């Protein structure tokens, strides 16, 4: 796996699924391929994206700044600086300085990542802030190692949260989660259907699913009533794909 592929993988792992994630993935691909050379426009676009947490925006801004060539006098962006200040905790800054001194002695991506994984997310963010604010300099490889270590820690905590959601025994949470997933699947079906002349069937199935969920939420139904809702939708989607000559079994 190449360095940039690894960085892209780690960064995308902390972004919630949805159309925005697909858009960010495309921007990252363009940046890493040298196709997007206007850093200021890129940062302005990032600043106004909804849903993303300030820290996620800070990490993306840091990655863009590392990768896109820019004029020396270009101002650092406040939204990135604020995100990478370790919540203003002096303890995080002290640890960030210690980590920075270690990273200065390292020259490899994997070495830097290994060292960085021993620190808290707050300290890692503060260390990125030091580098972003030009208070310290490391090689791009080392900076990317720091980015990936931070993303790994964030992804670990997100995964624990998802696992708790998936294994919860609370029937109301499970019921709502199934309905949310069904709506997300319906939206994906609509996007995949696109403008194809045979798309009306897929659009109708997706629309019916949305209406059913809306009715279930309005009336209030037994928590078991949503069981299998998403799977039914997926079966319909795969039957539609088969008729269209597309074989994809990756959604379950």
From Swiss-Prot:
One of its GO terms (cellular component) is membrane. GO terms for molecular function: RNA binding; structural constituent of virion. Residues 1-164 are annotated as: Membrane-binding. The keyword Transferase does not apply. It is found in: Virion membrane; Host nucleus. It comes from the Viruses. Residues 165-252 are annotated as: RNP-binding. A motif (Nuclear localization signal) lies at residues 101-105. Plays critical roles in virus replication, from virus entry and uncoating to assembly and budding of the virus particle. M1 binding to ribonucleocapsids (RNPs) in nucleus seems to inhibit viral transcription. Interaction of viral NEP with M1-RNP is thought to promote nuclear export of the complex, which is targeted to the virion assembly site at the apical plasma membrane in polarized epithelial cells. Interactions with NA and HA may bring M1, a non-raft-associated protein, into lipid rafts. Forms a continuous shell on the inner side of the lipid bilayer in virion, where it binds the RNP. Determines the virion's shape: spherical or filamentous. Clinical isolates of influenza are characterized by the presence of significant proportion of filamentous virions, whereas after multiple passage on eggs or cell culture, virions have only spherical morphology. Filamentous virions are thought to be important to infect neighboring cells, and spherical virions more suited to spread through aerosol between hosts organisms. Most abundant protein in virion. When expressed alone can form virus-like particles in transfected cells. Belongs to the influenza viruses Matrix protein M1 family. This is Matrix protein 1.
């Amino acid at each position: 796996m190449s360095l940039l592929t690894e960085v892209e993988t780690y960064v995308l792992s902390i972004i919630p699924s949805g159309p925005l994630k697909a858009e960010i993935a495309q921007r990252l691909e363009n940046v890493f391929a040298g196709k997007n050379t206007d850093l200021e426009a890129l940062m302005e676009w990032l600043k106004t994206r909804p849903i993303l947490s300030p820290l996620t925006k800070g990490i993306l801004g840091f990655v863009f700044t590392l990768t896109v060539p820019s004029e020396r006098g270009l101002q650092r962006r406040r939204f990135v600086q604020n995100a990478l200040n370790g919540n203003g905790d002096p303890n995080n800054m002290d640890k960030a300085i210690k980590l920075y001194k270690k990273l200065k002695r390292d020259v490899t991506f994997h070495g830097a990542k290994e060292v960085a994984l021993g620190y808290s997310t707050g300290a890692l963010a503060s260390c990125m802030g030091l580098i972003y604010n030009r208070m310290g300099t490391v090689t791009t490889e080392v900076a990317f190692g720091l980015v990936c270590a931070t993303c790994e820690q964030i992804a670990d905590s997100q995964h624990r949260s998802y696992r708790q959601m998936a294994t919860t025994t609370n029937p109301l949470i499970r019921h709502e989660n199934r309905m949310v997933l069904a709506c997300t699947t319906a939206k994906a079906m609509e996007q995949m259907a696109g403008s194809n002349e045979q798309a009306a069937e897929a659009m109708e199935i997706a629309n019916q699913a949305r209406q059913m969920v809306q009715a279930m939420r309005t009336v209030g139904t037994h928590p078991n009533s949503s069981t299998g809702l998403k799977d039914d939708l997926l079966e319909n989607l795969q039957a539609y794909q088969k008729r269209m000559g597309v074989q994809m079994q990756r959604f379950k």
